[in-house]
Amino acid sequence: MAETVNILIVDDSRTSKRILRNLLESQGYTVVAEAENGEEGYLKYKELRPDLVTMDITMPKMDGIESLTLIKKLDPNAKVVMITAAGQKEKMVEALKRGADEFITKPFDQEEVSTIIKRLVEQQ
């Protein structure tokens, strides 16, 4: 990878954040920050302006869809990958309507995550 790609992970699950961080860092990406909920994720995005955000949909305080909406309003070119549990089709459709770039389904598949992140990074 020629230049550093900075990624923000937004998820209320400590386990999910750890798995994603390990997976992303093993691919050469830099995780610049983690957030526990959508509100914190939005504030960290605003402060750090990472190249890409992974955002869980279901979180306390502010969900991922609301945070996605705020991020896209602030920066329409932001790259946001939504993380969802299987069976959340309605929420996936809503996130796409609000500007989500892609989806990753839990449990994480290393090849799927790598392919999606690489494709979005190359679009920048």
PLM features: residue spans?
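Receiver (REC) domain active-site loop signature in two-component systems and cognate sites
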Residues: 59
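C-terminal output helix
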Residues: 108-117
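Active-site beta3 strand of CheY-like receiver
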Residues: 48-54
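Acidic catalytic/metal-coordinating carboxylates
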Residues: 37-40, 63-66
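Two-component/phosphorelay signaling modules centered on CheY-like receiver
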Residues: 14-33
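Short, conserved "switch-loop" micro-motifs in signal-transduction and mechanochemical regulators
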Residues: 86-87
